[in-house]
C-alpha cells in the first residue's frame, strides 16, 4: 500500500471511529478512497450495509440514523445527555426533516421534525429531544425526564416551549405536560411520586423550604413531607442521623414525615402509602 493509500485509510477510519458508522456519501471518496474502502471491507476491518460504512461492532441505532441521514432522538438519545434511563430503549428512534420523502424502514421509529437541520451530528439537540418525548412519550416518565433536564440546566422551559407551538402534532398535550414539569425535582422517583399524587387529587409542592428543617422533596397537602430516599445517599451514619433529626424537627412543627424507598415508588405504592399515613395522622390529631 502506497503512501497515498495509507493516508486515505487513516482518513476513512478516523472519520468513522468517533460514532462507529457514517453514510458512504459523508466519506467523500475519490478513486483512491474507493479502492482503499473496498480493501477495508474485504479485510473485515469495516462493513457496509444500506450505504452505511461501519465498524463490525457499531451500535445498530447509529447505523439506523446514518442510513436515514437523520439524528437519534427519544429513548435513543437519553444516555447522550445523561437523562434518566426510565424508559425501555427498544428499537432506534430517528428524527428526519419533516419534508423528507417517503420512508418506511423496518425496525426503526421515524419522527418527522419541522425545522430540523441534519449536519454531521448524531443526536438531536436536547430541547428537540424533550419536545418530542412530551408529544408522544408516556406521561409520568416523560415529565420525570424533563424535570431532570430542567434541574440540571440542560435546557430551559422556554427552549422546549418554542418547539411546541400550534394546535397540531400533539402540541397542546405536550404544552400541558410541560406545565406539570418543575426544575425543583432532584430525582426521577421524586418526580414520579409527585405526578402520581397529583393525579390522585393531592396538592403537591416540590422543593418547599421549611425554616429549621430545610428543603422538602414533595410537600403533600401542606402537611406531609414525602421523602423518596435512595440508599446511596442515605446509607452513611451521618446521613442516617440527619434524617432522624429532620423528622423530629418536622414533627415538632406539626408536619408528618414519610420516607419511601425506590422500590415503593416504582412498584406504584406511593398513593396508598401516603393516603394511609395522612388518614392515621388525621385520626391522631
Report residues per predicted region.
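Short gly/ser-rich loop at a beta-strand->alpha-helix junction or flexible surface loop bordering the NTP-binding
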Residues: 1-170, 279-285
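Surface segments flanking catalytic/ligand-binding clefts of nucleic-acid enzymes
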Residues: 32, 150-285
